[in-house]
Structure formats: structure tokens, C-alpha cells
């Protein structure tokens, strides 16, 4: 009898555990439902060299609508970033892809937006507290722009640091995230 009850209990608890896993997995996937693009570039242990221009290509968006463009920065606690701020030059160029209109003629590529901005990223508070999230690496998300993009839009993004020191230690990764806004 005890063995039978243990087997029943084991089956019930296994089903709840499996069901909980499915629910948590679904929620995690649903959180990124509108994630259109994300890519990070890594740097060597020495850091980010000033001559290293990062290039990101966002190719052919699947949905039209409003998007937020974010800069992502990850710093390492193993090799700490020695400054409070990070200044980067952020260049973006968006075009609509060529497409056929209702008369079946090919329409030219259209420039949607081009900009070059210097972004001051605050990584550490005046009190010395990290403003990012994480434990062994700190993640910082810096909002850059809100864009209205058509289906098939393509983007080219270039990022370079504009700090006085030619090599920045402690920067592990820099990337770009594009999310559709609902």
C-alpha cells in the first residue's frame, strides 16, 4: 500500500513539476515576443580599442510598426571598468528595401533615417554604485531611439568609443537590441 501511494505521489509531483516548467518556459518566451534583433560583440581581455568600430546589420524586418533601439553594454567585475561614464559615437542608417508595387514595377530603396549621435552612458552613480544589473558582469541598456519602420526595413549601425584612453579595460561586450513596441 505504501509503495502504491508513493508511486501515485511521484506521478502527481512529476506532472506538477513538468507543468510548471512548461508555464515558466512559455512566460520566458512570451517576454521576448517582440524582440526583433539582438547582437553583441565581444572584446579581448585588454578591452575595447578605439580603432575597433562595431558594425551591426539588421536585415529585413518582418513586421511594420514602432520599434525601440537600445545600446547594450556589459562590463566585467573580473577586470573592472575604471570610469563612471562611457562615451560612444552611435551612427544609424535605415532604408526600406526595394519592393514591387501594385503595378508590378520595382520601387527604389528609400532612406528612412540617418543619424550620428554622441551618447554619454552613465554606468556608475556618484556614490560609486553600479547602475547596471548582474553579479559577475553588469548589463546596461541605454535607450537610443524610437523608430517607425516598414516591413523589410534594413539598418546599419556603427559604434565606436570616444573616450580619451585608446583602450578601455573592463568592457566585455557591446551590442544593439531592437524591440517592437505594442
Which residue stretches match the model-derived regions?
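Bacterial N-terminal signal peptides
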Residues: 18-26
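C-terminal motif of bacterial Sec signal peptides marking the signal peptidase cleavage site
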Residues: 29-30
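Coil residues (strongly favoring Ser/Thr
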Residues: 53, 60, 102-105, 118, ...
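Contiguous beta-strand segments within globular domains
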Residues: 62-73
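Short amphipathic, basic-aromatic surface patches that mediate peripheral association
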Residues: 73-80
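Short coil-to-beta strand junction motifs in C2/discoidin
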Residues: 81-88, 171
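A beta-strand/beta-hairpin structural motif
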Residues: 119-125, 130-143
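Internal, hydrophobic beta-strand segments that form the core of beta-sheet-rich folds
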Residues: 151-165, 170-180
Amino acid at each position: 500500500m505504501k509503495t502504491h501511494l508513493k508511486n501515485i505521489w511521484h506521478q502527481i509531483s512529476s506532472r506538477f513539476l513538468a507543468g510548471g516548467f512548461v508555464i515558466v518556459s512559455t512566460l520566458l518566451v512570451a517576454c521576448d515576443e517582440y524582440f526583433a534583433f539582438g547582437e553583441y560583440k565581444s572584446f579581448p581581455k585588454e578591452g575595447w580599442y578605439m580603432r575597433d568600430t562595431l558594425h551591426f546589420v539588421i536585415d529585413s524586418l518582418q513586421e511594420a510598426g514602432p520599434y525601440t533601439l537600445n545600446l547594450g553594454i556589459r562590463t566585467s567585475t573580473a577586470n573592472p571598468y575604471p570610469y563612471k561614464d562611457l562615451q560612444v559615437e552611435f551612427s544609424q542608417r535605415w532604408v526600406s528595401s526595394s519592393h514591387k508595387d501594385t503595378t508590378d514595377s520595382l520601387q527604389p530603396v528609400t532612406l528612412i533615417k540617418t543619424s550620428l549621435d554622441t551618447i554619454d552612458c552613465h554606468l556608475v552613480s556618484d556614490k560609486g554604485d553600479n547602475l547596471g544589473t548582474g553579479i559577475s558582469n553588469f548589463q546596461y541598456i541605454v535607450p537610443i531611439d524610437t523608430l517607425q519602420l516598414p516591413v523589410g526595413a534594413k539598418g546599419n549601425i556603427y559604434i565606436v568609443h570616444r573616450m580619451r584612453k585608446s583602450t578601455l579595460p573592463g568592457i566585455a561586450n557591446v551590442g544593439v537590441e531592437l524591440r517592437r513596441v505594442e
